[in-house]
Amino acid sequence: MLPLVIYVFIDVIAFSSVIIAVLPFHVMFLGAGPLVVTLYMSTFSFVQFFASPYIGRLSDKFGRKPMLITSCIADLISHSIMAIASSLNLVLLSRVIAGLFSCNISVGSAYISDITSLKDRTKYIGYYNAAFSLGFVIGPIVGGLLAGSDPSNPNYLRANLFAASMNFINLFILFFFLKSSKSLISSQKKTKKFLSEIFSIITNKNVSY
């Protein structure tokens, strides 16, 4: 449970350090007006809205951990693109990539449901949400500090590289410390049992066709 809480804390710091503190100014710096700025800020949520049901199904099929890792890789790619983005199209691409695979809330909550009892579930979801909220407090402050105080020459590269480095740390945490949830293990056992039963039926000489 602790690796998951640390993961979401770091993930939200990375996300909010860019989306809140840096993205609006980055887009304006590239020539966008107020309307375009708001559209770019909402792109992530818009894409996530349509992608979330599919991500949920994939997490049911392949497990929570693989989907969290995939989401983390997508965030790493997204922030790396934003770090070097010199056009609005590249910024848009980065937000679409992040939105397509974002699942820290839905899959993270499902993971908690898989590994906790009904009695303790609300407590651990509370810890998870607290880490999420704390990340949103710290992230924008860090992003603003890294971007600098000069409005004519903000350091977008430094802020986005920080976010990408946070994603890299999260990859390490997910790979080596987060255990697979019991839903995938249960699913694998059911699949093996089903296949063994089919095999026994086929090889059973007493079964008539």
Task: Enumerate the language-model features and the residues they cover.
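Juxtamembrane intracellular "pre-TM" segments in multi-pass secondary transporters
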Residues: 180-209
